[in-house]
Swiss-Prot record:
Belongs to the glycosyl hydrolase 27 family. The gene is aglD. The keyword Lipid biosynthesis does not apply. One of its GO terms (biological process) is polysaccharide catabolic process. This is Probable alpha-galactosidase D. CDD domains: CBM35_galactosidase-like, GH27. It comes from Aspergillus flavus (strain ATCC 200026 / FGSC A1120 / IAM 13836 / NRRL 3357 / JCM 12722 / SRRC 167). One of its GO terms (molecular function) is alpha-galactosidase activity. Residues 1-16 form the signal peptide. Disulfide bonds join 124-155. Keywords: Carbohydrate metabolism, Disulfide bond, Glycoprotein, Glycosidase, Hydrolase, Polysaccharide degradation, Secreted, Signal.
Length: 655
């Protein structure tokens, strides 16, 4: 397999993989929940007419039949005080027929009844005061109302600091408060979906699956395009925790709120869906003043994309490659039936052609490539796929009948003339003379060798035929890119070739010299993998430098970094959950990449506060020469508003 973005497991072996975290398993949310919520459009000012009108619209517009069934009234439905017996009640002015009647109305439409409550002393943006222990009583109330789901928020919850509306650095973990309500709900004779809404505090992916069916990965989505990038950067280290009954919640959808352009809405919906987020509509579908526009409605009704979200395999897509300066990136993941979904995001606000190299998502060939947003289908796609995409839009693809990367069947990739067979569309992740090729012959050869010629070199390579007479192996050169070709001369016909990239050479941070403010930091045992230390304070005044021997050409670097600079307060502004990293080779123009979060432990209480968790990201670099190369890891451009500090640097592998 070619190098890709991946996350090192930092758990002790006895604790297992994140996929195997204990989870609440009551048969609900086997796929991500879908529905509608009042908050994004109506804020904390819902009423009975609004909820009923939009619920009816779910049915009338054909959304309910596609799976959008949970109808949740968010903040603003309660009154200032509980009843004399301590139980919750609704605001009779806003909901004159009451919540039990609202639930019956929804159930009669074959919809599901969702309510909202808070783990603090009052609800976000609305009463009542909740001082005391009301979880058991509230759970009984919700069960008696025949509630189907509960969104449980996190406002006014930190006693040690006087219960402020919001505290992103609480004195204790929010986990016990959510655990109390989880236990209370479990004690009822009615199963309810429990949505943990802790805003990403204390890295809930480690504890929320045991308590609820979904957890908010970060702060609220805001009505701006930049919120998409910020949210995806926070999702990166959490995708491996997704699975049946435990879903990372990227927050409600802004599709249909007349805030994003149509291509932006397509990107928003596509990525929320393939990352297996709950799909909760936040737009006004139909009320006395508003109805959703048809283009946005068709996005919400895109059946293929809903199918990816609800796929029985239940595996989230993950970030595979990012090109910051070029303004695009690739996410992909597996689907049931051996299919693959891939999203190529155009971060630039201009229409252009973009190319997906299939090996970046682990594939070499696809018999069918379905382009969802432009409605076309391509057949027999070899190595690369190119399509036009609008500014801020996404090329969303479903790939079927695929071949794994590095596998080149002759009947697909080759043409033969006499004893010569030429394979086209050969992909190289890096420029190197150390690719390993295995030639598979159709029958045993009487010859002792075959001749191999790569367009990356004018030299002919002789490969010895194995004892079986059906295979020959050698090392060959390839250039970075998808335009290589290989010609094989053999008296026997060639069935296929297999090519694997070089392992490369690893250079830990200890091989680098720190300059200026940059410094080396030791980590706890088993962390900052695979080195056990890192270089921090990388900035415009702090760099790490090493002399690295290599051959000439364009080189792929697999960079081990650490970033747990979580955007909480800054999420309301320009916080992006990313840090800026630059790599300069031999004084050439640096390659810049904004790396996402890597932390998979609590930013408050976890080992190293999440700053010991390594991730790997790939970047292609120019300017390498034969012999020694001067390599500088820095943060050029940080002073221009990217980020003041780069991520911490663990090491890199040169392929």
């Amino acid at each position: 397999m070619l190098p890709k973005i991946f996350y090192l497991s930092l758990l002790p072996a006895a604790l297992g993989h994140p996929h195997l975290q204990p989870r609440l398993d009551n048969g609900l949310a086997r796929t991500p929940q879908m529905g509608w919520n009042t908050y994004n459009h109506y804020s904390c000012s819902p009423n009975e007419t609004i909820v009923r009108s939009n619920a009816q619209a779910l049915v009338d517009l054909g959304l309910a039949s596609l799976g959008y069934r949970y109808v949740t009234t968010d903040c603003g439905w309660t009154v200032a005080d509980r009843l004399s017996d301590g139980s919750l009640t609704w605001n009779e002015t806003l909901f004159p027929e009451g919540f039990p009647a609202l639930g019956k109305y929804l159930h009669d439409l074959d919809l599901l009844f969702g309510v909202y409550q808070d783990s603090g002393i009052k609800l976000c943006g609305s009463p009542p005061d909740n001082v005391g222990n009301y979880e058991d009583q509230d759970a009984r109330t919700f069960a008696s109302w025949e509630v189907d789901s509960l969104k449980y928020d996190n406002c006014y919850s930190d006693a040690a600091t006087g219960y402020p509306n919001v505290n992103y650095e609480p004195s204790t973990s929010p986990q016990p408060r959510f655990a109390n309500m989880s236990r209370a709900l479990a004690a009822q004779n009615r199963s309810m979906v429990f949505q943990v809404c802790e805003w990403g505090i204390d890295f809930p992916a480690r504890w929320a699956p045991a308590l609820g069916h979904s957890w908010r990965i970060g702060n609220d989505i805001i009505p701006h395009w930049r919120a998409i990038y910020r949210t995806l950067n926070q999702a990166v280290p959490q995708t491996s925790f997704a699975g049946p009954g435990q879903w990372p919640d990227l927050d409600m959808l802004f599709v249909g709120n007349d805030i994003l352009s149509i291509p932006e809405e397509q990107t928003h919906f596509s990525l929320w869906a393939i990352l297996k987020s709950p799909l909760t509509i936040g737009a006004a579908l139909k009320d006395d003043e508003t109805s959703i526009n048809d283009e946005s409605l068709q996005i919400l009704k895109q059946a293929d994309i809903i199918g990816y979200n609800q796929d029985s395999l239940g595996v989230s897509a993950s970030l595979r490659r990012r090109w910051t300066e070029e303004g695009y990136e690739v996410w992909s993941g597996p689907l049931s039936g051996g299919r693959t979904v891939a999203a190529l995001i155009n971060w630039r606000n201009e229409s252009r052609d973009l190319t997906l190299d299939l090996p970046d998502i682990g594939l070499q060939y696809a018999g069918t490539v379905k382009n969802i947003w432009d409605g076309t289908t391509a057949q027999n796609v070899k190595t690369s796929y190119t399509a036009k995409v609008q500014g801020h839009g996404t090329i969303l693809l479903e790939l079927q009948d695929t071949t794994a990367s590095g596998q080149y069947p002759g009947d697909t990739f080759a043409t033969s003339t006499g004893s010569s067979t030429t394979f086209e569309s050969i992909y190289g992740v890096t420029t190197s003379f150390r690719y390993n090729i295995t030639v598979k012959l159709s029958e045993a050869s009487s010859s002792s060798d075959v001749k191999i010629q790569s367009t990356a070199s004018n030299k002919t390579i002789t490969a010895q035929v194995s004892a079986s007479g059906t295979e020959a192996s050698a090392q060959i050169p390839l250039l970075a890119g998808s335009s290589n070709s290989i010609t094989i001369v053999s008296p026997q016909s060639v069935d296929a070739i297999t090519i694997t990239p070089p392992n490369g050479t690893y250079f830990p941070n200890t091989a680098f010299t720190t300059i200026g403010d940059a410094d080396t930091v030791s980590c706890g045992a088993g962390y900052c993998q695979p080195v056990g230390s890192k270089i921090g304070n990388i900035s415009t005044n702090g760099t790490a430098r090493a002399v690295i021997p290599a051959t000439a050409g364009t080189k792929y670097l697999a960079i081990d970094y650490i970033n747990n600079d979580v955007a909480f307060d800054s999420a309301w502004d320009w916080g992006s959950n990313s840090r800026n990293l630059t790599v300069s080779v031999n004084g050439n123009k640096p390659v810049r990449i904004e790396v996402p979060l890597s932390g998979q432990h609590s930013e408050l209480f976890g080992p190293g506060k999440g700053w010991w968790d390594t991730a790997t990201i790939g970047v292609l670099t120019e300017g390498w020469k034969d012999g020694d190369n001067d390599v500088v890891i820095g943060n050029e451009g940080g002073e221009s508003g990217f980020t003041s500090y780069g991520p911490d640097f663990v090491g890199l592998r040169v392929l």
